[in-house]
Amino acid sequence: MAAAFSHVIFDLDGTLLNTLDDLAAAGNHTCEMHGWPTFTVDEYRYKVGNGMLKLVERFMPAEYAGDGRAFEQSLAEFRAYYGEHKEDHTAPYAGTIEMLDRLRAAGIQFAVLTNKDHISAAPLIEKYFGSERFALVQGRVDAFPPKPEAPVTLHVMKELGANPATTLYVGDSNVDILTGHNAGLKSAGVSWGFRGRAELEAAGADYVVDTQDELAKLILGE
């Protein structure tokens, strides 16, 4: 039986890697430097997903909204701390490497498309997944608007030589479901990530899976 999809584009945070503790630690470190309120790890589940710029906006106190100088300083502090500590607690979700190798053995090509700064995303993929598994890693760069806008997804598709009809976008949040749909792709949500099944279904996910094995079977048409 032919695979249902020939290409898969994965989100990173909350999909392949559990990065939440390290993102929360960097956010709270920045807040503490300014004497601002901090947040629980669970509260950060709903602050991440749209890239580091939005994350910083979301943990800054409301009275600093529109304060460009405070924002730029906080962003620089966050990036510096996260850059040094992004691997403290981060790890692949259980079963992820095995799933990727199963797909790769079946001839599926896959890439990463994330709103995480490219300078952070690329080293994390290299460390936890090696340099051979992913055909392309695309983090946030100034040349493209962030997900869920379509241009960066279409760029990845072009680089892969992928057909929209046989390409699946996989992620853990409403942003990811929209990312796929905005580029004309089917979108699969993974319930093990930061947001959960209810958000994915409400966002209109074409599929929602609970395990890496379910995802592999979906992609392979088993």
Question: Where is each model-derived feature located?
Answer:
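Hydrophobic, well-ordered secondary-structure segments
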Residues: 30, 51, 77-88, 111, ...
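Conserved SAM-binding loop
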Residues: 16, 92, 110-113, 169-170, ...
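Asp-based, Mg2+/Mn2+-dependent phosphohydrolase catalytic module
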Residues: 1-7, 104, 118, 122-222
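Small/polar loops that bind or transfer phosphate-bearing groups
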Residues: 11, 19, 48, 112-113, ...
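Short amphipathic alpha-helical segments and helix-helix/interface helices
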Residues: 97-100, 197
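N-terminal helical cap/lid subdomain that shapes the substrate entry/recognition surface
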Residues: 2-98, 105-106, 119, 131
